[in-house]
Amino acid sequence: MVKVKFLGHAAFYIEGSKKILIDPFLTGNPQAVAKPEDFKDVDLILVTHAHGDHIGDAGEIAKISGAKIVAMYDIANYIAEKFKGVETVGMNYGPTEVDGVFIVQVPAWHSSSDGKYSIGNASGFIVKLDGKTIYHAGDTYVFKDMELFSELYGPIDVALLPIGGHFTMGVKEAAKAVELLKPRTVVPMHYNTWPPISADPEEFKKLVGDKAKVVVLKPGEELEL
Ligand code: NI
Ligand code: MN
């Protein structure tokens, strides 16, 4: 069984035969329900892009857990320089395998920077763990190539999609993404953390209709796959 726990904003904890964090922004995250110290035994940390609300505590958690950080090559180098001794796996768009976990880094239409200077490119991740397929979109606008993700790696058991607008897709665009991705279940994320990304997950649910099962997780809640 694979559990997908929502940690607030875009942070998720995936637990199966491996323990995986994605975008662990905990410190300073108004929605956070966990602290970096809660993840001393995590195996992998996936970072979708360099913005602070995604890199978050990745470096610190890697230090206390010995977890490997998987990210775009340039972002991995940036983290390795900031957090000496942390093990990183720098990759680019494409498939790879890290510690027996199949990971595809896929494009995302978004920027990636330290807030000022560009670092690498933004991405999403498709993770196959214990026979389950999880897609974390990162921060992105909707794009037609999302069709390829289900075509090449599907069926997608759960898609984690931003719905907050302003920096990413809003509810309308995310509902279109569901049409392209054809996931079994979709979990909205990256909304209501701050006023500019206010969104109503019930409106998203209505727009998705019967195209997928929408599970609205509160920070701290989890989904079993
Ligand atoms: Ni971002
Ligand atoms: Mn973001």
Swiss-Prot record:
InterPro entries: Metallo-B-lactamas, RibonucZ/Hydroxyglut_hydro, UPF0173, UPF0173_UPF0282_UlaG_hydrolase. Signal peptide: none annotated. It holds the Pfam family Lactamase_B_3. Keywords: Hydrolase. Coiled coil: none annotated. It comes from the Archaea. The keyword Mitochondrion does not apply. GO terms for molecular function: hydrolase activity. Belongs to the UPF0173 family. This is UPF0173 metal-dependent hydrolase PYRAB05000.
